[in-house]
């Protein structure tokens, strides 16, 4: 009887040979794989909330934002979803998303507000535009006032006008590569009292340049410290006052400002 392999069985030497081949194939896969995968498998997820029953200019800006961020998502491998259903501002529906946007409104019910508070307190990310940050004595949401760095709406210019903006801090990931100043398209600018700059936890990133004053025609802001973009460092958040254009001038039409919008999403979305 000759010695050899028994039919239907694999001896130890063959096991070793197969193992070496598997490891070699895996090494080749790692060597030549370029790291590209579908966004649903790899990229972070963003959910944008917006409303269609608000001021027409707010709706137009939200529609421009949706197109801008869908294009940004396609180019940067993340998932961008959007909804007009603010009831989705709840713990279950927010769970898959690393970042949420409020494009032209804010939550109205206690349940939605409580869900947002929990989401942010547990590491969620937020970018709010224009009226998303609005608060005064009628909104009755003290947590949100603190979240905004203590900033309370005081007044605004009217009509929307373009303005020169100053980049206060170009070391932030949101403002990196921005010019020292740039012209922002027509917008309704909010003045806050107290100013968020007074809060030690707030990092002001962009401010209305004083050379714009007085700004407005019907409603005029004569002077003052007017932060436009800032972050509360206690949270993963950034607020941007842009969001109410007029006279056919679109918020998402300036390259420098668009860079700011893109940087903010990519910064907060990629934060762990």
Give the location of each predicted region.
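N-terminal secretory signal peptides that target proteins for export/translocation
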Residues: 1-17
